[in-house]
Amino acid sequence: AEGLNREQYVYLANVSEQAERYEEMVEFMQKVVVGSTPASELTVEERNLLSVAYKNVIGSLRAAWRIVSSIEQKEEGRKNDDHVSLVKHYRSKVENELTQVCATILSLLDSNLVPSASASESKVFYLKMKGDYHRYLAEFKVGDERKTATEDTMLSYKAAQDIASADLPPTHPIRLGLALNFSVFYYEILNQSDKACAMAKQAFEEAIAELDTLGEESYKDSTLIMQLLRDNLTLWTSDVQDQLDEP
């Protein structure tokens, strides 16, 4: 599929999404991004296709990593050294793929997407995405690499949050999605459950207060994310209770 035009790549990305061939979907959308000039920003449809493509590829790798890691822990518990070294080696293979996928999308974001984003909505979208992929690195990296990934996540989410708070309504699905992921970062990566809860709660309450401003088109997206924020809050506050209740 070389030398096609933008519309053709977008069409093939749609086809590959329906066929659930997400690696190819990523490749088609990379072509769209690299072929677009700063003057021709991605449309909302193209932006979403890019996001879905990478989210699926990284999603299956993250799931694989979690499974392999839990097998590794079990084998360590059993003191089975041969199996431990095999599964460690296999885990590092999955980690190399994770690193590679994150590197390619982060490079597209830094070189093309973030610099050419003009509207606040797209700036927040891409900065959030940048935070997400640094966070996925922070999930499995250790030592200095983890520290760097964590700092980069914080900077990206913070930059996105500054723009979102100033320019997007509290009910905007991208602003809500940012609050959701930023709060998960506080909870899972930084282990700051109080900060995570405060952020999720604030985003939820600010959106509830302005529910009447919700447009027809984003109603479903926004209420879905609000539900997720609330689910996390319920989960996290019960976790905090557990910690407090433990003798």
From Swiss-Prot:
Belongs to the 14-3-3 family. It comes from the Eukaryota. This is 14-3-3-like protein B. It holds the Pfam family 14-3-3. GO terms for cellular component: cytoplasm. GO terms for biological process: protein localization; signal transduction. The lineage of its organism: Eukaryota, Viridiplantae, Streptophyta, Embryophyta, Tracheophyta. The gene is GF14B. Gene3D superfamilies: 14-3-3 domain (1.20.190.20).
